[in-house]
């Protein structure tokens, strides 16, 4: 499934002391033990650790900048990583094919990446091998999701879509600033500070636009669009914040489920559908919320700290969550968003969770690991 990241944006961080590596190895051992000792996931599925890599020695070499030519098939399976002050890509087998130091913010996906300074006038876009792919010749902040390129204007109230050559395809402009955004192959959904939600098709035509309402103060904190474009969801409002699920299958957009939330978050939220459009996972003031789009019900998984990464494996109804409060981290696995089947806590400075189809990648400081969910047809 698609990875979930806050705008898929990385910020460079300092390289940690070597003592952190021993803590990280201990954390990976605990997580591996959790997979062995955890309650089985139904009748067949189970967790299978595949590999763990210590990137410290490789990235601290005399020439850490590296690029290995890869073929088109390999590029499609590469995953981005950010450890310390290094950004790069690795294969499913754990080989680093590209790595470089970064000192500025960047946006990245499995298909492309771009570094943008504070006042970007034009932004080059590169493929996972570090080769020049396109250039966005307009000022603003580049945002990359899968193979889709977007540019947010300096004023914050407009977003444009670009093709693989850097040519603008469409542009959406509103009077209020954009506060939430997400895209899929079917189009994009945009949330604004005045509470407006707009859904556009892949060609940029407006599918629908509405104000969810239901709260004292209207503002949109998170949005997401299903892969086929038939469903959208958003978290909106202050003073009675709520989450809504919207059907886009008919001519008119229709709210088919909503729930008011205890507590309220006031920042841009992590939020996404799984690949099949069965579940929505979203950041919540008390942890992580999960909407079952078939049963039309919302469950809350209680957690302490900030949600770093989360996702759903729809084949076995498994939700994985990585949270962090200061240096204390928690990796937890839930079945059907209700039953906890695995839980481990450890200390780390920098952690991340990337979801894949029937697998996920976990980074702990300078360590990287792959764990598969096996036993699924």
From Swiss-Prot:
One cellular component (GO) term of this entry: membrane
Domain of life according to the entry: Bacteria
Topology versus the membrane: Single-pass membrane protein
SUPFAM superfamilies: YVTN repeat-like/Quinoprotein amine dehydrogenase (SSF50969)
Localization in the cell: Membrane
Residue intervals passing through the bilayer: 21-43
InterPro entries per record: Quino_amine_DH_bsu
UniProt keyword list: Membrane, Transmembrane, Transmembrane helix
The protein's name: Uncharacterized protein TP_0783
Naturally occurring in which organism (per UniProt): Treponema pallidum (strain Nichols)
């Amino acid at each position: 499934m698609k990875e979930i990241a806050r705008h898929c944006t990385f910020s460079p961080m300092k390289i940690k002391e070597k003592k952190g590596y021993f803590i990280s190895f201990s954390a990976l051992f605990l997580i591996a033990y959790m997979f062995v000792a955890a309650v089985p996931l139904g009748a067949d599925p189970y967790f299978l650790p595949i590999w763990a890599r210590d990137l410290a020695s490789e990235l601290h070499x005399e020439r850490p900048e590296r690029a290995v030519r890869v073929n088109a098939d390999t590029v499609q399976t590469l995953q981005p990583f950010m450890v310390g002050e290094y950004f790069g890509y690795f294969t499913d087998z754990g080989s680093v094919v590209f790595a470089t130091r970064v000192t500025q913010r960047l946006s990245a996906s499995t298909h492309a990446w771009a570094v943008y300074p504070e006042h970007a006038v034009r932004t080059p876009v590169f493929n996972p091998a570090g080769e020049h792919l396109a250039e966005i010749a307009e000022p603003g902040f580049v945002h990359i999701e899968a193979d889709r390129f977007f540019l947010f204007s300096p004023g914050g109230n407009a977003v444009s879509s670009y093709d693989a050559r850097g040519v603008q395809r469409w542009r959406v402009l509103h009077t209020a600033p954009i506060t939430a955004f997400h895209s899929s192959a079917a189009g994009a959904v945009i949330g604004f500070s005045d509470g407006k939600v707009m859904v556009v098709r892949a060609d940029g035509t407006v599918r629908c636009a509405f104000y969810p309402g239901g709260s004292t103060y209207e503002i949109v904190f998170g949005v997401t669009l299903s892969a086929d474009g038939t469903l959208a969801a958003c978290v909106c409002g202050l003073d009675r914040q709520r989450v809504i699920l919207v059907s886009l299958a008919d001519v008119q957009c229709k709210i088919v489920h909503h729930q008011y939330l205890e507590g309220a978050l006031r920042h841009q939220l992590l939020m996404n559908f799984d690949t099949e459009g069965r579940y929505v996972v979203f950041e919540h003031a008390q942890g992580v919320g999960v909407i079952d789009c078939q049963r039309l019900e919302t469950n809350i998984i209680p957690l302490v700290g900030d949600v770093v990464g989360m996702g759903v494996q729809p084949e076995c109804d498994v939700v994985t969550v990585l949270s962090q409060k200061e240096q204390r981290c928690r990796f937890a696995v839930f079945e059907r968003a209700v039953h906890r089947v695995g839980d481990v806590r450890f200390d780390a400075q920098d952690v991340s969770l990337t979801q894949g189809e029937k697998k996920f990648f976990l980074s702990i400081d300078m360590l990287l690991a792959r764990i598969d969910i096996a036993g699924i047809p």
